[in-house]
């Protein structure tokens, strides 16, 4: 398919969870019904369902597509010779783990071939849990892809991306994210020479905004800052490979048309993007460090009320003003399981070893917290207002244990000396108050 210039002006629709509608040509959207006998433009009506028909209306996600060829027009899928190597779970390992950034490959590698499986909570056929990947790429996709296994949350760390989807175009860059519904066909084009980032595949309930509770009606990620594409299509009869991820395996078929042939659509099962720089950060103006749940951007609810299947949490630039307080994130043992990445700058709990493009994993009850250098500085610091700037760390937090993949445990990026950052914690105890 053609590579679309980054200078092309993209238009978006604003809002979260809306019943959106868009058409690239007049009369693409039928009036008063979803599936007319004869569409005025000769298009096929196709429903794209992200939930069961009988879920509560507030949970229902579906979109009606009006396209040149129905998605059913394809030949038999064949299992691909090239699969994602090393994605099977490695040996059980309760240790705290940290990885250096993965290098951009030298050989031509597109977004799909560049997926690196790091950890997963469960088998893909279970309608819960998450899988975590890194991606590295140096060439645009010349094929289309969709995942039958889950919703994708894409977090760029290096390089801008244009994501061509059935419902339109999304441009994202580092400090922005994109969410792609389960089953949505897309193609990732590079707007720079290379790209690297993180990917969370959500096998459970679709991501949504967290409840605000006593915070009130505003704050955290605001609905109006989420952007959904407008209809865009290509009418092409050039053959194109379509790859799907099904139960963790890659299968492909050959299309005799473009899968990006949706001329109009309406519904709420849609892709979207969000600029993390627009997050309205909440924090203390008195004392102590609040729980990190105040930094939640998106959440997928789990089976236990109040315990998320996945929370997407960020640690953005912010002011630290707490009085008489140890200001870094405190030492912690947690029921939840925490995968962290760093998009930009430095993380305020780790002075060394955690670099942009790197990652860490602290599973259930793994003791963690600020490293020795950070703790010493925080205890001795003069407590005046301080701004943490030029930073963006994030966390995928899940109620299920994340099993590292065999590749994640065997790769050279794994830091074998991670535990050493807590080795020389000073003994400051005294029986007489200071």
Curated annotation (Swiss-Prot):
Family designation: Belongs to the homogentisate dioxygenase family.
Protein name: Homogentisate 1,2-dioxygenase
Upper taxonomic lineage: Bacteria, Pseudomonadati, Pseudomonadota, Gammaproteobacteria, Pseudomonadales
Annotated catalytic residues: 289
Keywords noted in UniProt: Dioxygenase, Iron, Metal-binding, Oxidoreductase, Phenylalanine catabolism, Tyrosine catabolism
Residues involved in homogentisate binding: 347, 368
UniProt-listed InterPro entries: HgmA_C, HgmA_N, Homogentis_dOase, Homogentis_dOase_bac, RmlC-like_jellyroll, RmlC_Cupin_sf
Catalysed reactions, semicolon-separated: homogentisate + O2 = 4-maleylacetoacetate + H(+)
